[in-house]
Amino acid sequence: MRTYQQALQRACEQGGPVLRGTADMYVGMSEVHRERDDLPAATRQLLRSQELGEHTGLPQNRYRWRVAMARIREAEGDLGGALDLLNEAERLYVGDFFPNVRPVPALKARLRVARGELGEALGWARERGLSVADDLSYLREFEHITLARVLLARYTAEGTERPLQEATRLLERLLRAAEEGQRTGSVI
């Protein structure tokens, strides 16, 4: 949070018009607040970003804003509203220099699981060609963790052991890969 606050302070010290990228910093602070389970503060930061206007955001800001708001809606229990925002985000996404390590379709699959729409979540995994035997990479780690969640939901729905065993093996492999890659956030 401190990094965002320092960057905002420096941006404001420049004087003149609001610098491009300022709105993105508010979106980032919103995500930190949401992670801390301070949903009112997270919402305020997003509204501040919106008040600044689209011209103060970088090209991906419209996409990131909707993903951030969707995650707030999900935390509030508004799964339908979250899904609508993710659909908007998916339409607005434009690739850039940064890899998309948390793709919207994976976020939507997680929402589908939460809504009890296991068939749709399994369909997502099939469309993406995901398997518990895949070679693991950081770029697809979020998708594989989502696959594990889908398998656990399948186990809960069907009561058969196979999805549980597959999810366990996949999570063990993901843990080893994260530890070897020193990705503490993934390990947690």
Q: What are these language model-derived features?
A:
Residues M1-I188:
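Helix-coil-helix junctions within alpha-helical repeat/solenoid scaffolds
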